[in-house]
């Protein structure tokens, strides 16, 4: 499984990327708005830090507007992936963009049917939102299992990005089910690193080393 970072915060991206585990970044209008900066400027700066796919989302509702915005965003850097909402207009945009060689990430997917349609339209990535499904008392991981099964059955090449990740268990379950990617908030990535027994072990080693009076 690959890890993307789900943020538009430059400092978080720099810190996470330095760990050597991040393969890409996903953003959305809400994340960019939180930074209070120019959209294209933020995306451009991310592209200077991360050597991998960077998802930037369109705002228009109609496919003509989506395609126009996508073409502009794609000019920023070769690694830009265009996030397109899962709507009929979105599918039209994906169909056009895929024929132009522009990579797309279809977002706000809440069913396996939606993922299948997005992939058939030419999406490079599909992003099912597991956390938001959990929020409405639905098993969010079931959609990952369903999409993995369908894509495997028909040798569909679109990659599955597990999105709306709320905690490390979401990542673990998605990895066990075979999702290609998990896009995680910075907070969740930090939670994945930590374990109380690791901290206890480190302190015990330090104490034993100090008692023995050893040096490197």
Curated annotation (Swiss-Prot):
Keyword Transferase in record: yes
UniProt record, GO biological process: carbohydrate metabolic process; pentose-phosphate shunt
EC number from the UniProt entry: 2.2.1.2
CDD domains, per database record: Transaldolase_FSA (cd00956)
Catalytic activity: D-sedoheptulose 7-phosphate + D-glyceraldehyde 3-phosphate = D-erythrose 4-phosphate + beta-D-fructose 6-phosphate
Compartment(s): Cytoplasm
Catalytic residues as annotated in Swiss-Prot or TrEMBL: 83 (schiff-base intermediate with substrate)
Pfam families: TAL_FSA
Disulfides per UniProt: none
Keywords: Cytoplasm, Pentose shunt, Schiff base, Transferase
PROSITE patterns per the UniProt record, alphabetical: TRANSALDOLASE_1
GO MF, any single term: aldehyde-lyase activity
CC terms in the record's Gene Ontology section: cytoplasm
Family (UniProt): Belongs to the transaldolase family. Type 3B subfamily.
Name of the protein described by the UniProt record: Probable transaldolase
